[in-house]
Amino acid sequence: MATIRADEISNIIRERIEQYNREVKIVNTGTVLQVGDGIARIYGLDEVMAGELVEFEEGTIGIALNLESKNVGVVLMGDGLLIQEGSSVKATGRIAQIPVSEAYLGRVINALAKPIDGRGEISSSESRLIESPAPGIISRRSVYEPLQTGLIAIDAMIPIGRGQRELIIGDRQTGKTAVATDTILNQQGNNVICVYVAIGQKASSVAQVVNALQERGAMEYTIVVAEAADSPATLQYLAPYTGAALAEYFMYRERHTLIIYDDPSKQAQAYRQMSLLLRRPPGREAYPGDVFYLHSRLLERAAKLSSRLGEGSMTALPIVETQSGDVSAYIPTNVISITDGQIFLSADLFNAGIRPAINVGISVSRVGSAAQIKAMKQVAGKLKLELAQFAELEAFAQFSSDLDKATQNQLARGQRLRELLKQSQAKPLTVAEQILTIYTGTNGYLDSFEIAQVRKFLDELRDYVKTRKPQFEEIISSTKIFTEEAQALLKDAIQEQKELFLVQE
């Protein structure tokens, strides 16, 4: 018969008591009262905070946006079809964040930074909050470096600098996205990371943009964040912040970034939908009262960082669609007041064959010539003045038949200058090519040509200078000044090409 030893038993009990760990885990939970239209009402979740992520029983994640006395309004990051009334919800103690890394370059992702291009998972060891505060005044420096778009009309007259926010605004089908994609194409070799955010666009339109970038090798330095028109409103609302978080990751690593939001008015519509379903009081055009803050906190994140922070930059180009040219609507006026200038695209100019259809008269850059190299300043001033005088004269000439010779010459010059601003899509020009084009027009070398011949002559002149006078481009790129030597080279090239051109014709 086995003997029971009291000391052994007491030792075992003592060990067990020492091992006992009284851990109390408090989980903040709630119960689904109602779900539908991408919104859930939750009873409980007493300790939840505004903007906190909550997790439903079947795995769907939501964001707590409305904290009311009797329930919590949650917007869902998915369709929520499997969420049932009465199921449990728990607070996660986290706010929305995404993984970030260099591996995102060349990929197409959604608002949660998950790849949607079928090319496998993206590895990353770091993460960033989707919403983070914009750099303060001390953290910034004024914009002084140009961000070249490759479009003469913009780089000469409405220059954009690194760290600026420039709005692209116009009716539908006026070439807004084309201006943005041309700007991305022109960053090739400039060490600029581009982020294109498509909000509520047709999936076919996004695919078209991605294909255009892939064909020209621009996806190597580009990230596309896409939430199509059929995506939940919550994800359309988050997509721009996801793009901004990715661009910020590179900006704080002393890199230059360009982010295109296409377009914030669709984000505002998604936010309006969420707000109305959460029963927040509607304001002007049924948008909620904080729709200005929605865009300002996004666009303020674009900055040129101070030298202490490494001089990285984030340039933002939001695209806003207007209805029949009405720029006084709520969202356009909001975004105009937040940005540092706007580029107006006109349907009338587009239909008249002037493409890019930029209305230079009412477009403006609040940074101005600070965002131009000296060589461009030297030639662009005259172009601006002559085009402004031409626009005035053209309006006057409609009412008058007998114009003197000087006025006729000025009108003829203006028509040729307008012609040199035309560019084909996906054919951005280098700064040197733009300078030689503007110089040729403003100094009267095009006056002897028919309007129909202008573009052909300029194309051939640019090729001629590139092959026969490579020193011209070298001088501009090395000194950034339109020197007398460069001017002499260009004059010779124009004369030689003119003779060749006239012989061919």
From Swiss-Prot:
Homology family: Belongs to the ATPase alpha/beta chains family.
GO molecular function: ADP binding; ATP binding; proton-transporting ATP synthase activity, rotational mechanism
Localization per record: Plastid, Chloroplast thylakoid membrane
Signal peptide feature range: none
Keywords: ATP synthesis, ATP-binding, CF(1), Chloroplast, Hydrogen ion transport, Ion transport, Membrane, Nucleotide-binding, Plastid, Thylakoid, Translocase, Transport
Keyword check for Cell division: no
Quaternary context: F-type ATPases have 2 components, CF(1) - the catalytic core - and CF(0) - the membrane proton channel. CF(1) has five subunits: alpha(3), beta(3), gamma(1), delta(1), epsilon(1). CF(0) has four main subunits: a, b, b' and c.
The protein's name in its UniProt record: ATP synthase subunit alpha, chloroplastic
Annotated positions binding ATP: G170, D171, R172, Q173, T174, G175, K176, T177
Keyword check for Translocase: yes
GO CC annotations on file: chloroplast thylakoid membrane; proton-transporting ATP synthase complex
PANTHER family given in the database record: ATP SYNTHASE SUBUNIT ALPHA, MITOCHONDRIAL
Function text: Produces ATP from ADP in the presence of a proton gradient across the membrane. The alpha chain is a regulatory subunit.
EC number(s) on file: 7.1.2.2
Top EC class, one word: translocase
Site features described as Required for activity, chain residue numbers: S363
Record's bilayer topology term: Peripheral membrane protein
Catalytic activity: ATP + H2O + 4 H(+)(in) = ADP + phosphate + 5 H(+)(out)
